[in-house]
Amino acid sequence: MQNYENTYRRLLLYADSMKIIDTHEHLQPNQNYLGDQPDVLCDYLSHYITTDLMSAGMSGEDLEKVKDYKTDILKRFKILEPYLESVKNTSYYRALEIGAKKIHKINEISVRTIEELNEKFKKAAICEDYGRNIMKNLCNIEVSINDNWSQDMKFSTTDLFVPTCQFSPDGNLSENLTFDEYCENYRQYFLKQKNDGMKTIKNVMAYWRTLYVEDVDYNTAKDLYTEVLKNKIDFPRKLEDYMLHVLLKIADENNFVIQIHTGLQEGMGNNLENSNPMLLRNLFNKYQNLSFDIFHMGYPYERELIVLAKTYANVYIDLCWAHIISPVAARNAFYEMLDVLPYTKILGFGGDYCFFDGVVGHITMAKQDICEVLAKKICSGECDIDLAEKILQAVLHDNAKRVFKL
């Protein structure tokens, strides 16, 4: 029987030596997210851990005070400290602590260290190659699929990134456009993005509505479009549904991969039922030649998603965000995926961060999760080291390269 610790360490060393393809980020140019000057609290509290802090009782008003970089950082940290202490058990916090340690050589985030951490962060973040050094040298990432929440693809079209953009059904509305012209403009927009290097289109509509999409006929959609322009109303759901089908046909014709947010939504008080991946079955059936990259392992609907990926050849499971939502859930789901699915259906890592330090923590946790599961499978006799290394190479690199045609 294999020794678990030795096996785990061997796999981890192998993972550390590999180039990794990062399936999903929201990374920004430094000047976009650092504002007037770099500040580690503004950066680290830009998302994710803020949900834990607010869950622990922190008010939005106090959060804004903590992120006011013009105020002394010790004063701000004293507001943050009681809430931060109560979330130090969470995976979101752990990712930040790992990033602070690996990048800035600070072992904890505390009142004792915050000034030094901030000074080191500020000094590093103003360097032009800050992000490149993190992604290429610390993380060994070959390329990332990047949604920087911008219609300007320039930042995301470099050797660091491949751009993606979000489905927006009501973009570029104009009273001067007929419905047919509007649909054609939609098509031309995505063709332009394809020429700029885009490989995927991202659907995040589970944040505001159900993932279920009906079939809507042309005349109904055209009448609704006319009503929207005439009465200045929001896009009705049926018109959104029609435009999503337009998008999926464009994607099918142009070999785009559709990335879909499922499961847990970032932030407070969202409707989780909107995001169950089972709501997508009719699309998987209708567009069988189109590849669907289903995000966040569907958590907490990961078992439903595993079954979908098993029974639909065009459905892939993406563990982006998953390892910092819950490493335990990610490990359990990955173990089960390997029991149920071809390993070629699994995409193992996407940082899903808007700042670079977070990626370091997340990729560290992801490699630990994946290697722990594979080591357990080796030690239980379910696979040998050669197969485990093939799986590791596939889920962290080769599968994404093939699916996204990189």
Spans of model-derived segments:
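Short acidic/histidine-rich active-site segments
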Residues: 30, 261, 293-297, 318-321, ...
